[in-house]
């Protein structure tokens, strides 16, 4: 299961209390109209509220400001209208986890459309936007709060509140890769009965000469821990869009009916060549007769975020 990214920042405080900035983005990547941004206090009470049905809207309330933003694909829209509101059922909560300095904040800022200026230097933000994936709109709320100083309660709540998890490591740092493996084990313990999407992300793939973790190592780790895998470069914006669209697909595959998922995948299958279909079919037959081949087949599919 494979995907491909950037950098992190440090958090700040406002008005004597620790706060998280919530930013909303829309439209294509690149210079565009102002981005709506909200201040959200980050404390134990807020994250506890996010765990209860219907409480995410209350936790998201804050003062509206404006800031710069980048473009998302042309089919992406801003679903937050003046006077409108989000609901827990329509918003997918995505948690970014990983060691310091691997690029979690850079990936989040690209998603949120904020990369330049002093605001881009702060970590501990929440970004939300609506994107269209496979012809259907979805709202994502991306939490970049893993490294905030919230005491012992913060990691536990982060691992309990997500609809999907993105575990980021740097391909230039073997230690961050090992940390990512540890986080996957912790998630399995925290969400034993939940079938939540987990995507392993090897960021900074553009730093070829400094690479310490190969693509094969990342893919093998994803297969062993039963999660998807992708390499990104936040610096080059490589695979960042594919990452977040893949998150939406993985959530839908687990939540939606078989009929709805089959309808979405029909368009993709129509575009697939006959040769690819035959190759995939033969691969499945061979995999049934060999554990080693089955492992290889699974490792090849771990990069495909449109399938389970």
Curated annotation (Swiss-Prot):
Under what conditions is it induced? Down-regulated in failing hearts.
* Keywords linked to the UniProt accession: Calmodulin-binding, Cell membrane, GTP-binding, Membrane, Methylation, Nucleotide-binding, Phosphoprotein
Q: Which residues are recorded with the post-translational modification Phosphoserine?
A: 26
- Show the GO MF annotations: calcium channel regulator activity; calmodulin binding; GTP binding; GTPase activity
Q: Which Gene3D superfamilies match?
A: P-loop containing nucleotide triphosphate hydrolases (3.40.50.300)
Q: Name one GO biological process term.
A: small GTPase-mediated signal transduction
* Expressing tissues: Most abundantly expressed in the heart. Also found in the skeletal muscle and lung. Lesser amounts in placenta and kidney. Also detected in adipose tissue. Overexpressed in muscle of type II diabetic humans.
Cellular component per GO, a single term? cytosol
**Region (Calmodulin-binding): which ranges?**
278-297
Subcellular localization(s) per the UniProt record: Cell membrane
Q: Where is this region: Disordered?
A: 1-88
In what ranges is there compositional bias, type Low complexity? 48-68
Q: Where does GTP bind?
A: 98-105, 203-206
User: Does the record's keyword annotation contain Cell membrane?
Assistant: yes
Q: Where is the composition biased (Gly residues)?
A: 1-16
Recorded superkingdom: Eukaryota
Assembly, per entry? Interacts with calmodulin preferentially in the inactive, GDP-bound form. Binds CAMKII which is capable of phosphorylating RAD in vitro. Interacts with CAMK2D. Interacts with CACNB2; interaction may be involved in beta-adrenergic regulation of heart rate and contractile force. Interaction with CACNB2 regulates the trafficking of CACNA1C to the cell membrane.
Q: What role is this protein assigned?
A: May regulate basal voltage-dependent L-type Ca(2+) currents and be required for beta-adrenergic augmentation of Ca(2+) influx in cardiomyocytes, thereby regulating increases in heart rate and contractile force. May play an important role in cardiac antiarrhythmia via the strong suppression of voltage-gated L-type Ca(2+) currents. Regulates voltage-dependent L-type calcium channel subunit alpha-1C trafficking to the cell membrane. Inhibits cardiac hypertrophy through the calmodulin-dependent kinase II (CaMKII) pathway. Inhibits phosphorylation and activation of CAMK2D.
Q: Which family does it belong to?
A: Belongs to the small GTPase superfamily. RGK family.
- This one is known as GTP-binding protein RAD
Taxonomic lineage is:
Eukaryota, Metazoa, Chordata, Craniata, Vertebrata
